[in-house]
Amino acid sequence: MGKSGGKRPGSQKRTKTDELPIHRDLPLVIEGLPAGTRIEGYRDFVVQDLKIAAHNTRYRRTVYRLPDGSLQVADLPAEVSGHFGVQLKQFILYQVHQTHVSHARLLEQLHEYGIDISAGQLNAILLYGHDAFHAEKEALLPTAREVSGVLHTDDTSARHRGQNAVCTHFGNELFASFHTTDSKSRLNFLRLLCLPEERYSLNEEMLLSLELWGAPQVLQERIAALEEAAYLGRETFAKQLDRWGITSESHRTMVCEAALYGTLLTERWYDNLGLVSDDAPQFKLLGFVHGLCWVHAERKVSRLIPLTPQHQQAVENLRDQIWKFYQRLQAYRVAPRETQRVRLADEFDRLFQQRTGYPALNEALKLLFAKRDGLLAVLEHPHLPLHNNLSESDIREYARLRKVSGGTRSDLGRRCRDTFLSLKKTCRKLGVSFWQFLKDRLSGAATIPPLPDLMRQAAAAH
């Protein structure tokens, strides 16, 4: 029997098009039917399509001559800003930040659609008038400090003004925030942790940090003689260092790090937050709960190149033992018990203190055992993830964008890239359409709540 053209008899399954909004109904008729024929109804066939074309609106602003002889012109609608409309700006931002279309190809695309726009005008749309977007992005990390228990972090290389730079990522299941800066260092990481304000504090915590980091005694005494104070901004604090006669670059860096650390410890922003990262030195901070990524750690073993079958077998055996131990740690996270905690700690010691007949593998075991506190942080803090895959996945988006457009050439361009990438990834995690988000913010409709508010709601729901 032939197909009837509809669903199978008795099927209750709804078609995929049942809930689509219909923009146009087009009745189809048959000509030349015999007399007495009557219409019984319709069988709908829905076709999805897309309209892409220039759409120009001419606002004819009425000019009035008032009785006193003066002229008054009707105002433009509130959403009109310049000679390019909301949907065009939305499309441009989406193409660049979501689909990673290069500026040159986007300009060509717009010209083929019939849009009269220059390279300079396209650049202006991408760079200017985004203060509200920047403010929303800058609120993501402080909000995460309030509502989260875990913060993933990682970094990747970047290019800015033709020079090497670094992009640092913070994120978890609620948000992602990207920050491109000039250097990869502990000082840079501390500055980012203090966002949105870079505040330098002279207090007991700062002095303790200088002592623990082995600052010269003369430097410690000079700082200890100063009154407690707080300085807002990098330039302000740099001027204070000049007034105090601290000219050595290494001493200035050490004091800046300690002053930022003093702010973090005083504000207690990260007391209930665990950091998860690879073992990069800039992420190592005293007083922080810091879990290390097992995937990164295991690479010290997986990247070995054994030259004999015996060495190859030793590597395979150890990798098998590591991942079986990893699975037991995952089970502990779900249902932690004291007896299991002690047993896992002992098992870790036996696993990474063993010796094989492969010297390079023995060296890898020593290095992994030295990371014991970070790799076993989950035993004291079961909420910590055992890997940093979330951060690596997020930051891969930045790497793809870097391949398309290379580096940034202006500070504003760098800021826009960080902002829109952060907002896009955060929208995705919160279940918000980035396309609709752009339209909502550009039009001023504000029907989508601020992303920090959605983060708080999502955290409360969990």
Which residues fall in each region the model found?
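Conserved beta-strand -> loop -> alpha-helix junction used to position metal-binding or nucleic-acid-contacting
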Residues: 274-275, 279-282, 286-318
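Short, positively charged, Gly/Tyr-enriched micro-motifs
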Residues: 51-149, 332, 424
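Mobile genetic element proteins and their domesticated derivatives, centered on retroelements
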Residues: 33, 66, 92, 106, ...
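Short, flexible loop/hinge motifs at secondary-structure junctions
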Residues: 1-83, 153, 199-256, 263-265
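Short helix/loop capping segments that flank catalytic or ligand/cofactor-binding pockets
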Residues: 41, 74-76, 160-162, 169, ...
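Acidic/histidine-rich catalytic cores and adjacent linkers
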Residues: 230-251, 267, 273, 277-285, ...
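Two-metal-ion RNase H-like nuclease active-site motif
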Residues: 146-160, 277-278
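Acidic, metal-ligating active-site segments
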Residues: 90-94, 152, 160-229, 237-240
